[in-house]
Amino acid sequence: MTSVRKTMELIKELVSIPSPTGNTYEVINYIESLLKEWKVETVRNHKGGLIATLPGRDTSRHRMLTAHVDTLGAMVKEIKADGRLKIDLIGGFRYNSIEGEYCQIETASGKMYTGTILMHQTSVHVYKDAGKAERNQENMEIRLDEPVHCRKDTEELGIGVGDFVSFDPRVEITSSGFIKSRHLDDKASVALLLRLIHEIQTEDIELPYTTHFLISNNEEIGYGGNSNIPPETVEYLAVDMGAIGDGQATDEYSVSICVKDASGPYHYQLRKHLVQLAEKHHIDYKLDIYPYYGSDASAAIKSGHDIVHGLIGPGIDASHAFERTHKSSLRHTAKLLYYYVQSPMV
């Protein structure tokens, strides 16, 4: 089985490459170069996602597995009179989850600037309502790490409306086996799929069905994996994080098998097949329901594709904020993926 340490190191590399939805070219290039090194056939779709294909014995029925490499982020909405930046969020999260975070601003010419996302009324020595003021677009801003005093100063740096903003991942691997970072959703799963591909190649595993691996790049806005699905595809498995919180079964130490999200139930027979594989191979798993969640698989169903769809992934604490998971969850997810791609279809 693939090394969890190598998976965690790959996650660290991936989260360190900024890739907010809409600006994923650099990380897609990086992944494409890895797959080329491993002599894996790839093609890009027009949306900018990457599809890798491994041939199988049965070429009439295909599988597709997907994970998304796009992350939460922001765009410059306005340059304020004092030279600071108002932002517009990309993806589903709240301003409080990025308050105090370091960030990067990429200009249209490709130049990078750094800054910090702050409340305008941050100083408790000046603003009486510093703790009570609402964290919203009007009150949050980017303080640039440049000597700017007015709108013109910022414009002269080349910064403008529509420039992408990415957040510092602050990635760290602990001695106790955790990896904590922004954007484990869903770069942890991308790393798992890449390590699976590498394992299939190096072990010369013959897959029962031709299998496609889609690295999607628009999942955080709802349509990453809803197209470019080969017509022979029967099973479609999204690999994405399991969410942890009150009333949830998911934890940081097992693989999550989603039975239902905001789109409705996932395919019952595929769910049962995944559970049977987990029990047969002594894989720790949790069945769970995510009420405010969607995936590439649910997006594909909504787009009208006639597929058997499923969703599994590592359990991620504090999703869409300061995320964390444990090597145990990564190991169990990797194990289930390994046995799934070699199993018969439902």
UniProtKB/Swiss-Prot annotation:
Binding site for a divalent metal cation 2: D185, E220, H320
Matches recorded under InterPro entries: Peptidase_M42 (IPR008007), Peptidase_M42_aminopept (IPR051464), Peptidase_M42_dom2 (IPR023367)
Enzyme Commission (EC) number: 3.4.11.-
UniProt keyword terms in alphabetical order: Aminopeptidase, Hydrolase, Metal-binding, Metalloprotease, Protease
Swiss-Prot/TrEMBL cofactor(s): a divalent metal cation
Binding site for a divalent metal cation 1: H68, D185, D240
Record keyword Signal present: no
GO biological process, any: proteolysis
Pfam families: Peptidase_M42 (PF05343)
Domain of life: Bacteria
Active site (UniProt): E219 (proton acceptor)
GO molecular function, one term: aminopeptidase activity
Cross-referenced SUPFAM superfamilies: Aminopeptidase/glucanase lid domain, Zn-dependent exopeptidases
Record-stated family: Belongs to the peptidase M42 family.
Protein's name according to its UniProt entry: Putative aminopeptidase YhfE
